[in-house]
Amino acid sequence: MRYTHCPDCGQRLSARPIGDEGLVPWCESCRRPWFDTFSTCIITAVMNEKGEVLLQRETRRPDREVLVAGYIKPGESAEDAARREIREETGLTATTLRYMGSWPHMEGNMLMLGFAATAEGEPSPDSSEILSDRWATMEDAVRSLREGSIAQQVVMAIRDHK
């Protein structure tokens, strides 16, 4: 989000050069910069003991398969958010969790932190967000996820790291 008015005093911001940052929204009244903000989210490829990836269909987009994803709550670490989202969206408990990298999602004004997780058992989501899920081989997951999507990039990063 790009600020146009100061969140503290409401004054319209001006652009001021700040070091290597270039022009930054600046409040003359509060004498401080307001850097652009974005949401930080997790996206996790949950895998079973066979190395299969859990693909899900959400109620809001039933035509597309996705990975477990969600927003990080205030005071929550990225790892805790990944474990929480896995529990909420699959009913599974992550036995391992490995950070894979970060991907900017410009359309959603988000930074996605990617993880690989392993879990045992079969998914039983307790979420109204999830329509269905299935286990897929790594290659089937790459083919099934939207071309160029962050989900596809996370799965390819896991595949290529082995």
Model-derived features: where do they sit?
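A generic fold-level signal
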Residues: 1, 39, 48, 107-110, ...
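Short connector loops at helix/strand junctions that flank enzyme active sites
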Residues: 22, 37-41, 62, 67, ...
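Conserved beta-strand segments that form the floor/walls of ligand-binding pockets within enzyme
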Residues: 26, 54, 66, 98, ...
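Conserved hydrophobic/aromatic beta-strand scaffold that supports enzyme active sites
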Residues: 5, 45, 55, 114-116, ...
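Acidic, metal-coordinating catalytic segment for phosphate/diphosphate chemistry
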Residues: 1-44
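Conserved Nudix-box catalytic region and its N-terminal flanking loop in Nudix hydrolases
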Residues: 45-88
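A broadly conserved sequence feature marking short terminus-proximal activation segments
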Residues: 1-3, 156-162
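Unchanged
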Residues: 72-157
